[in-house]
């Protein structure tokens, strides 16, 4: 088992799995629970096949919650969206290395600097088939890594078991480079009460849970149980 020396566990319910016909109530479940983060998936139907919501929705949600807004940009051009989501009330923004590294229209370091200059936490996300090595050179500049444990785009998918080894690899790198107090590992996708402990033991300390929370009979109880693992 990898020793997780990072700060305490963070549960980040993913609003993508919520009932959008009663969004205020769904957000209040999170407000009334022990969670401190709310995960907001932003999709443009280009980088991923789904389309979610934009900065105006985030701005409206901000009026009803003081939680840490963790904005996950699953978009083909994250740089052009940064200002809108910063202004909408994001507290942290993650972008996909696959949308930046390969083409260098806006190199990752430019996005990192812009996010950090706005006094937000900055994360880099990697898809299941993307190796960790591609983001090693950016680790000292960011606050968290998002390990996608499902293919990004849709809620309710099954957890990809190989994600455990990737988390362990990243945790070892973080500890060896003395970045333990700086960089968190977020695991996003297929997180359930029955597998969350394995993810934590592998070294993750931020768990994004969508369907497990919002499709449960008691979302508040589900969040609180996960938070106590």
Residue ranges and their predicted role:
Residues 2-94, 99-107, 114, 122, ...:
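Conserved N-terminal beta1-alpha1 strand-loop-helix module at the mouth
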Residues 39, 186-187:
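Generic enzyme active-site microenvironment
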Residues 90, 203-205:
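Conserved acetyl-CoA-binding loop of GNAT-fold acetyltransferases
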Residues 125-129:
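Short gly/ser/thr-rich secondary-structure transition/capping motifs
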Residues 187-190, 208-211:
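Glycine-rich beta-strand-to-loop/alpha-helix junction loops that act as flexible
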Residues 190-202:
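Acidic, divalent-metal-coordinating active-site segment for phosphoryl/phosphodiester hydrolysis
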